Amino acid sequence: DGKTPNTLFSLYKNAGIIPAGEAKGGISSALRVGLMYDSRNFEAAPTKGIWAEAHVAFAPKFIGTSVGYTKFNITFRHYVPIYRDRLVFAFRLNYQGYIGAAPAFYILPFDTILGPGYDRDGFGGYRTVRGLMRDRVQGINTGYFNTELRWKFVDFHVWKQNVTLALSGFFDGSRVFKGIDMESKIKLLNMGLDNFNFDYTSDKLNDRFHLAAGGGLRIIINQNFIVAVEYGKAFDKQDNAKGALYINTGYLF
């Protein structure tokens, strides 16, 4: 209609960044092959050990995928006891991306995992990078880290149940290592985009880390049921100006 698009989706669609055939979504059907190593002493609340995994997801068209792709994902987690099982330093490192052609745009946010569990929708939020807005970080090749200091400061019994209270402080971050080059396509459009920030639309720009920090309290019952309350705050207001409160179960990793 000649008017400037009023949403990013409309802008990317009109510029051809999102192809017309992908604009209404599609199907993703994949086969995953990988390896996992797990030496944690307790699955729910580990105090020592390593939990590492690597996998490749194949999603060819002949098994029903609308736009074929191949994705890899590598995750390393380590639990380091500092003082017995009372004070533990834990960290998680992740790097993932696509081999060959880029996938459809609607596949980019998903963080695929190996083993039991479910795929996560984008980086940002309780299951990936606390303090950041959900889906804040997306790209062809991406990575994130979580670091956490866990302190079990008191134990007691209630109704014959073992109860532990624990505090934690965390520092998380994520970054795009390879983005999608959209700058040239957008600049070809004469849409009056004088205020559009093209710095965020080039794969040649080195993205910075999107960082956040915070802390939380956990109630651990019988070493296997955990109630968690955490608050995270992003360092940059563009990543999340308000901070985020999480009430959930278990540890992040």
Q: What positions do the PLM features span?
A:
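Hydrophobic, well-ordered secondary-structure elements that form the walls
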Residues: 93, 147, 172, 217, ...
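Aromatic- and glycine-enriched pocket-lining scaffold segments that form the walls
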Residues: 1, 27-28, 48
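Outer-membrane beta-barrel "beta-signal"
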Residues: 219, 241-253
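C-terminal outer-membrane beta-barrel translocator/porin domains of Gram-negative envelope proteins
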Residues: 21, 31-34, 42-161, 177-179, ...
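Outer-membrane beta-barrel transmembrane domain signature
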Residues: 2-12, 21-22, 86, 166-213
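Outer-membrane beta-barrel transmembrane domain signature of Gram-negative proteins
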Residues: 5-43, 203
